[in-house]
From Swiss-Prot:
Protein name: Movement protein
Family, similarity comment: Belongs to the nucleorhabdovirus type-1 movement protein family.
Keywords: Host-virus interaction, RNA-binding, Transport, Viral movement protein
Organism field: Taro vein chlorosis virus
Superkingdom per UniProt: Viruses
RNA-binding keyword on record: yes
Functional summary from the UniProt entry: Transports viral genome to neighboring plant cells directly through plasmosdesmata, without any budding. The movement protein allows efficient cell to cell propagation, by bypassing the host cell wall barrier.
A GO biological-process term: transport of virus in host, cell to cell
A GO molecular-function descriptor: RNA binding
């Protein structure tokens, strides 16, 4: 097993199936489930009493990626606590508008895995700004870890996590005049997603431009890739249920709302664009 496993910090104590999106003035406890690139969470209950009950990691890499650097402002203070300890192993202050990465090295102790799943806690405090960002952590584990010692936790399949689509609001944007090339690309992807959902659901479902944007921002995946082997009437009910569940998440997600705000700010900086079309995109998806 590759000892370098990346996982994400989930909001509150929810499953960390998507990155933490830090809204303005977010204060409180955030936690993470360690996941591999396979279907389910790596860490779980012991298979037998003789199996190892602890895991050791020697370094931790923290990354911050602003979702909307053109308008993001304020400071991020990220405090990482290991195994619910009171003394933090990492305390970072950084502008929310810039992308950064920091590492912690040394023996960070043992992680108990008796409970399923294991949680690593982080406390996000002092965030101020109008936009969101993504926090990710790479945990460099003990190379002696034996995966056969553990039985997996059957949580949320990570298929969606592994099918990242394009990121549209590029970090190359500045306060200068904003190029509109990727706005046109985003429009193409919205239209393509609407057509794909309509086809995969046998013509029974039509999503709005606003709902399409929510799906793109939340899951960063092309629906046709997610369900490409499930076309036809045999998979119709499954596809309908999948799209419905994804829409429920996407239309209420924090990242969707933050992305919409960011897109609105970028459009305000543009001189010429299809105002009527983008007004539909920016409309509330819940309606």
């Amino acid at each position: 097993m590759d000892p370098h496993t990346e996982f994400f910090l989930g909001k509150d104590r929810e499953n960390a199936s998507s990155p933490l999106i830090a809204p303005s003035r977010k204060i409180g406890l955030i936690s993470a489930k360690v996941k591999t690139n396979e279907t389910y969470s790596l860490f779980g209950k012991k298979k037998n009493q003789t199996a190892g009950t602890h895991l050791q990691f020697t370094s931790l890499t923290i990354k911050w990626t602003p979702l909307c650097p053109v308008t993001a402002g304020g400071q991020l203070n990220l405090v990482i606590h290991h195994n619910s300890s009171t003394v933090p192993i990492l305390n970072i202050w950084s502008p929310t508008s810039t992308k950064w990465q920091q590492e912690v090295h040394g023996n960070l102790g043992f992680l108990t895995v008796n409970n399923c799943p294991y949680l690593v806690e982080g406390r996000l405090v002092g965030f101020s700004g109008t936009e969101a960002g993504i926090i990710s952590i790479t945990l460099h584990m003990d190379f002696k870890l034996r995966t056969q010692d553990l039985s997996p936790c059957k949580l949320i399949p990570s298929l969606i996590d592994n099918l990242h689509g394009p990121s549209f609001l590029y970090t190359s944007y500045t306060e200068d005049s904003v190029p509109d090339t990727n706005i046109h690309h985003l429009k193409h992807c919205i239209e393509d997603l609407q057509a794909s959902v309509h086809a995969l659901c046998g013509g029974r479902v039509h999503i709005t431009e606003s709902q399409a944007l929510s799906l793109i921002a939340t899951f960063r995946v092309r629906i046709v890739e997610l369900l490409e082997h499930q076309e036809g009437t045999a998979f119709l009910n499954y596809n309908l249920a999948t799209i419905k569940n994804m829409l429920t998440v996407a239309t209420t997600s924090v990242v969707s709302k933050s992305y919409r705000t960011c897109l609105s700010n970028i459009l305000d900086k543009m001189v010429v664009y299809d105002e009527a079309y983008w007004k539909k995109v920016l409309a509330s998806p819940e309606k």
